[in-house]
Amino acid sequence: MFMMLKNKVAIVTGGTRGIGFAVVKKFIENGAAVSLWGSRQETVDQALEQLKELYPDAKISGKYPSLKDTAQVTAMINQVKEEFGAVDILVNNAGISQSTSFYNYQPEEFQKIVDLNVTAVFNCSQAAAKIMKEQGGGVILNTSSMVSIYGQPSGCGYPASKFAVNGLTKSLARELGCDNIRVNAVAPGITRTDMVAALPEAVIKPLIATIPLGRVGEPEDIANAFLFLASDMASYVTGEILSVDGAARS
């Protein structure tokens, strides 16, 4: 079996469920050692237990730093390098959404989204990039969203934060290219995560009607895009925001 990430070391934030967990599994299946990061020890331990059952020979670890704490992030990334010998791939997937209307938005709600969806991406990318530069290169991948391009009628903090991620992605691609560090983002459309699965059918059906492929995306669909961008098959791809949405907004 051809393994696209053989002998690579990856960090995946927000890796305990949904898209992040699918990315972790896809990377392991393709030969990578993976450190999955989550917000709580309990969820990290549960994810590790599942992975060890599925992939008993895999090289995996789990961590739960506060991603807005620069010192914690730097320490954890350095630990990953010590554990596995390198940091080749960083996937900034951790994030939160909010559906509050603009008129009712509280400043602390907006700041919370910025902290995790933007500041955390900056912190993790900066710490990882320093190691990647020393190694001679690496890959940074960010989770964006199609609403970063088209907006949404409520919860403006989420699309605003993902638009910021797009800008950071493109800027870092230009700045870090000389150090052989590629930076891209994946912008998923409606994907069958826990959040979407909880929506009533009356909400889901109209959404599916807007998708030419006639279905919502699966986490594995998004994970496949991350796998491609992380691999050497995308060695000349950087600064891109790859939409994976079934042509919902094309």
UniProtKB/Swiss-Prot annotation:
InterPro entries: NAD(P)-bd_dom_sf (IPR036291), Sc_DH/Rdtase_CS (IPR020904), SDR_fam (IPR002347). Transformation of DCA is more efficient at pH 10 than pH 7. One of its GO terms (molecular function) is quinone binding. It catalyses: lithocholate + NADP(+) = 3-oxo-5beta-cholan-24-oate + NADPH + H(+); deoxycholate + NADP(+) = 12alpha-hydroxy-3-oxo-5beta-cholan-24-oate + NADPH + H(+); deoxycholate + NAD(+) = 12alpha-hydroxy-3-oxo-5beta-cholan-24-oate + NADH + H(+); cholate + NADP(+) = 7alpha,12alpha-dihydroxy-3-oxo-5beta-cholan-24-oate + NADPH + H(+). NADP(+) binds at N93, Y158, K162. The active site is at Y158 (proton acceptor). PANTHER family: 3-OXOACYL-[ACYL-CARRIER-PROTEIN] REDUCTASE, SHORT-CHAIN DEHYDROGENASES/REDUCTASES FAMILY MEMBER. NCBIfam families: PRK07231.1, PRK12826.1-2. Involved in the modification of secondary bile acids into iso-bile acids (3beta-bile acids) via epimerization of the 3-OH group through a 3-oxo-intermediate. Catalyzes the oxidation of deoxycholate (DCA) and lithocholate (LCA) to yield 12-alpha-hydroxy-3-oxo-5-beta-cholan-24-oate (3-oxo-DCA) and 3-oxo-5-beta-cholan-24-oate (3-oxo-LCA), respectively. Is also able to catalyze the oxidation of cholate (CA) and chenodeoxycholate (CDCA) into 3-dehydrocholate (3-oxo-CA) and 7-alpha-hydroxy-3-oxo-5-beta-cholan-24-oate (3-oxo-CDCA), respectively. Can also catalyze the reverse reactions in vitro. This is 3alpha-hydroxysteroid dehydrogenase. It comes from Mediterraneibacter gnavus (strain ATCC 29149 / DSM 114966 / JCM 6515 / VPI C7-9).
